[in-house]
Curated annotation (Swiss-Prot):
Keyword Iron-sulfur: no
Subcellular location(s) of the protein: Nucleus, Nucleolus
Coiled coil stretches, renumbered: 271-304
Composition bias type Basic and acidic residues, residue spans: 272-303, 318-329
Organism lineage string: Eukaryota, Metazoa, Ecdysozoa, Arthropoda, Hexapoda
Cellular component terms per the entry's GO annotation: nucleolus; nucleoplasm; small-subunit processome
GO biological process, one term: rRNA processing
GO molecular function, one term: RNA binding
InterPro entries: KH_dom, KH_dom_type_1_sf, KRR1-like_KH1, KRR1-like_KH1_euk, KRR1-like_KH2, KRR1-like_KH2_euk, rRNA_assembly_KRR1
Segments for region (Disordered): 231-347
Official protein name in the record: KRR1 small subunit processome component homolog
Functional note: Required for 40S ribosome biogenesis. Involved in nucleolar processing of pre-18S ribosomal RNA and ribosome assembly. Binds to RNA. Required for female germline development, cell viability during eye development and for survival of dividing cells and epithelial cells during early wing disk development.
PANTHER family to which the protein is assigned, alphabetical: HIV-1 REV BINDING PROTEIN 2, 3, KRR1 SMALL SUBUNIT PROCESSOME COMPONENT HOMOLOG
């Protein structure tokens, strides 16, 4: 190591970092690895049948893109696989991982124009599996559609806020962009599949973006500015009408139930002889029969008992008086009418 290189090493800043995302990672150059790779590395991935036509059309562009990094790409239409390999000229040890991510994204229906961006140093990708996060298929489809939004509006807003390309395909969500944005996309997707609407996280990201512009709030807690949403999903369990109170906890086991002999000892029946027991049973039987006969007589005589009449109230009494006055006939006037009628008939 020369003196100039040792001086540069001593000038490295060791102060605490306020924002780790703002740090620039030094670029890896060809001079850092002049001898290349010792062994050949390769990665292969399968692709579905419906992607065969598209991949066949863009494969010359794929070979050109990986050829700039001294890699080799192969397309096997018989087995339905894509392979990327290192060559003797390959000097970047991590570029094979980037190329593997590129062919994985292309197999997940990501277009080549977007997938080739993953070969850049500041760009990464994340394939989020969402198929096993929800048990019922109806709920899974509903929450996945909630992530896309009406006419793709929700997905577009996520892309604008995170600077990432997001594609929802089947049981996976493919994201491509800066590493900070990938972290935010993963959080939004997982919370959406856990029944948290994505609009809440989008609103929080918009507020954070505005707060980042104010340097006075750099060292303050932002939780007071962020919206707090309460869960409105109430328990759908039907509450019983009569709730049984819980018994007090006792460390001792419950008392042993009394046997037939214990009950006979308590009542004194155990010490009676056979004739006395039979007489007691006969007496109990007679008392039961007498009670049953009494109840049966009451049930039979119930129909012959006259109902109790209520005494008439004041209004009813007046109505009865009016009816009786109307029903009275004037005998004298009736006689006079009859005499008149007889005279007319004689004349």
């Amino acid at each position: 190591m020369s003196d100039s290189e040792s001086e540069e090493a001593t000038k490295i800043n060791t102060d605490p970092v306020d924002n780790a995302w703002s740090l620039k990672i030094p670029a890896f150059k060809e001079t850092d690895n002049p001898h290349g790779m010792i062994e050949e590395s390769s990665f292969a991935t399968l692709f579905p049948k419906y992607r065969e036509k598209y991949l066949k059309e863009v494969w010359p562009l794929v070979e050109q893109a990986v050829g700039e990094h001294h890699l080799k790409a192969e397309l096997d239409l018989v087995e339905g696989s894509m392979v990327v390999k290192t060559t003797r000229k390959t000097w970047d040890p991590y570029i094979i991982i980037k190329a593997r991510d590129m062919i994985k994204l292309m197999a997940r229906s990501v277009p080549f124009e977007q997938a080739k961006r993953v070969l850049q140093d500041e760009i990464g990708c994340d394939i989020i599996k969402i198929g096993n996060l929800v048990q019922k298929k109806e709920k899974f489809v509903k929450r996945r559609q909630r992530l896309i939004g009406p006419n793709g509006a929700t997905l577009k807003s996520i892309e604008l806020l995170t600077d990432c390309y997001v594609l929802v395909q089947g049981n996976t969500v493919s994201a491509l962009g800066p590493y900070k944005g990938l972290q935010q996309v993963r959080d939004i997707v997982l919370e959406t599949m856990n029944n948290v609407h994505p609009i809440y996280n989008i609103k929080a990201l918009m507020i954070k973006r505005e707060l980042m512009k104010d340097p006075k709030l750099a060292n303050e807690d932002w939780s007071r500015f962020l919206p707090k949403f309460k869960n409105k999903n109430l328990s759908k369990r039907k509450q019983p009408k009569v709730k049984k109170p819980k018994k007090e906890y006792t460390p001792f086991p419950p008392a042993q139930p009394e046997s037939k002999i214990d009950k006979q000892l308590a009542s004194g029946e155990y010490f009676l002889n056979k004739e006395q027991k039979q007489a007691k049973r006969q007496q109990e039987r007679q008392t039961k029969q007498a009670e049953a006969a009494k109840k049966q007589d009451e049930r039979r005589n119930k129909d012959f008992i006259p109902p109790t009449e209520e005494p008439p109230t004041g209004s009813k009494r007046k109505a009865n008086d009016n009816d009786s006055s109307d029903s009275r006939v004037d005998v004298q006037s009736l006689k006079a009418k009859l005499l008149k009628a007889n005279k007319k008939s004689k004349s």
